[in-house]
């Protein structure tokens, strides 16, 4: 099942994608190409993983981590499909990060790896937008690098776990203005989804609608105002957002 939320005639409508159309709870059909998408659900806590793909640490001049490197993203950074990402004024290097996002469906603490997938509700597409200027200095862990308003585009759909046969065998691609800039596969993760869920739940309780951004492969490049970022995760969806200058 692929579900989401749209704004229609001033009201929030919960929708399901079926045969290329969006159907709301009243049975009314909507065109996905014209729909005003909202976040597909209301996320709780947003966790991110840094350096979780083979080769990504190397392109940054860093060593691969021995255990998951975690950070949090603030709720104000969340952004729906097609909404504009604001490029902060005065920064030199802003880039996309195409990621598979895991959505928790069942609460748990100290979850063993063997049971971790039982706690996964589904998946969506994320773009972990980052200001490279603030990575590798006193702002790491990257609150200032990754926590700006509009820096976590998410969506457009929540895809139920049963629709994704193997989340560790998916292609990821990022395009800027239609040009392929980043390509990888989820089997390049250093830490698998069960390992990540088990690791996080050792020291905190995971709750329904917590979101885990599982990291990005190598292939980052700069984006500017006027660019359009398109993130694709096989079997999950396509997330697109334009870049605009920050409004003051």
Task: Outline where the language-model segments fall.
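Short acidic (Asp/Glu) patches
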Residues: 30-35, 64-65, 79-91, 138-139
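N-terminal non-catalytic cap/leader segment that marks the start of a structured domain
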Residues: 1-68, 162-165, 173, 179-180, ...
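Structural signature of FAD isoalloxazine-binding scaffolds in flavoprotein oxidoreductases
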Residues: 64-81, 96, 230-234
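A generic local secondary-structure boundary/capping motif
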Residues: 36-38, 59-60, 85-94, 108-115, ...
């Amino acid at each position: 099942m692929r579900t989401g939320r749209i704004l229609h005639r001033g009201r929030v409508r919960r929708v399901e994608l079926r045969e290329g159309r969006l159907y709301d709870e009243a049975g009314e059909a909507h065109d996905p190409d014209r729909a005003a998408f909202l976040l597909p659900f209301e996320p709780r806590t947003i966790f991110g993983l840094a350096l979780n793909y083979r080769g990504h640490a190397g392109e940054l001049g860093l060593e691969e981590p021995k255990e998951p490197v975690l950070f949090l993203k603030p709720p104000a950074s969340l952004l729906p499909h097609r909404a504009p990402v604001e490029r902060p004024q005065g920064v030199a290097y802003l880039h996309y990060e195409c990621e598979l996002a895991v959505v928790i469906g069942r609460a748990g603490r100290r979850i063993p790896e063997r049971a971790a997938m039982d706690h996964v509700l589904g998946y969506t597409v994320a773009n972990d937008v980052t200001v490279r200027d603030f990575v590798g200095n006193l702002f790491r862990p990257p609150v200032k690098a990754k926590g700006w308003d509009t820096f976590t585009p998410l969506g457009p759909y929540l895809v139920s776990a049963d629709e994704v046969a193997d989340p560790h065998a998916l292609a990821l691609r990022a395009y800027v203005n239609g040009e392929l800039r980043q390509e990888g596969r989820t089997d390049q993760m250093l830490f698998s989804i069960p390992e990540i869920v088990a690791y996080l739940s050792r020291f905190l309780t995971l709750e329904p609608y917590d979101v885990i951004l599982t990291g990005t492969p190598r292939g980052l490049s700069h984006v500017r105002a006027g660019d359009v970022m398109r993130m694709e995760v096989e079997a999950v969806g396509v997330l697109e957002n334009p870049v605009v200058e920050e409004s003051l």
